[in-house]
Amino acid sequence: METVRTTCPYCGVGCGVLARPDGGPVAGDAAHPASGGRLCSKGSALAETTGLADRLLHPEVNGRRASWDAALDTVAEGFRRALASHGPEGTALYVSGQLLTEDYYAANKLAKAALGTANIDSNSRLCMASAVAAHTRAFGEDLVPGIYEDLELADLVVLVGSNLAWCHPVLYQRLAAARAARPEMKLIVLDPRRTASCEGATLHLPLRPGSDVALFAALLVHLHDNGFADAAFLASRTEGLEPTLQAARAVAAEAPALTGLAPSLIQAFCSLFARHPKVVTLWSQGVNQSSAGTDKANALINCHLLTGRIGAPGMGPFSITGQPNAMGGREVGALSTMLAAHLRQDRPEDVALLRDYWRAPALPEKPVS
């Protein structure tokens, strides 16, 4: 029976799947670079979603079957009425981190070039907007300075706001296999709860919810004051060290009270981080879905920038997404504040560049306010 190579649509790992058109059992794709043939329980059950009884096989309009032409005409007429009555701001698209990159690009172009509206957003807004803002604030662009292989090469992995064992199981399996092969590899978990990811961890810090910034401020000060700053990296690749340290010192002294952690536990965390140059700090929704999500992400990124532990194998700050193509949506600009290729909707020069490239005079001037 023919098999089709595809991707699991669930978590951010995006595992490779071998599926059969007849709805037979699925299998992991051993050639896939992220999963290497592994599937979790949800991925293994994908075939159960392909049964025909409950699937919509044809377009429907008002609950009745329609041809594709009739359905598309209905959608187009709806957009025409909205544009005539309310202008471009009367239209909107809501898309998903489960779309293919090409589909994401087409949807974004439909909204911004054809409809003339910046009213397109993705459910990635909920899971990744804080990381997007933190990356942009730290690096100037929304770029992730790490790959999955870094987890296997690191001497220390720090999980922040991530129950990797349950939420990204195949990636956790890769981490567990790496630790089994190198027992000296350390794992620290920062999470108010004791989750499955804490099993076998070197250290668990049950910090008070929302106190991550204080903990990483304490770490930043410890690294600087104990000689772990990379002076050459700081001079050539960064700016703003002194005001950052000043702000961190104002918080670091209160870290035990703010985090609810014993000073000895904070010291143990800082010491482990300092002693292991090859460190990956991996964060997910426990950081992002927060009123201070951007500040939390920047606080941990700053610790990597201070020490130069970024941009080399086995080290760096690493944001993992909630869905397999959240990054693809960001790359094609399918958010109300972004344009294709990491261009920004709030930069007139970026708008002009894309308007010329797309030949799209209707491209909106600014993001949704």
Per-region residue spans from a language model:
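N-terminal export/assembly segments and adjacent metallocofactor-ligating motifs
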Residues: M1-N226, T244, A262, H304, ...
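Short alpha-helical "patches" and their helix-cap loops
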Residues: L57, D230-E239, G260, P313-N325
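Intrinsically disordered or highly flexible coil/loop and linker segments, enriched in small
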Residues: A84-P88, I120, E184, D225-A229, ...
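Conserved short loop/turn motifs at secondary-structure junctions
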Residues: A92-L100, A257-L261, S284-S291, Q323
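N-terminal leader/propeptide and maturation segments of large enzyme subunits in energy/redox metabolism
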Residues: A154, N226-P263, A340-L353, Y357-A362
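Flexible glycine/proline-enriched surface loops and loop-helix/loop-strand junctions
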Residues: V157, G200-A201, A250-A253, W283-V287
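Core structural elements
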Residues: L245-A247, I266-V279
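A glycine-rich, hydrophobic/aromatic-adjacent loop/helix-cap motif
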Residues: A274-S369
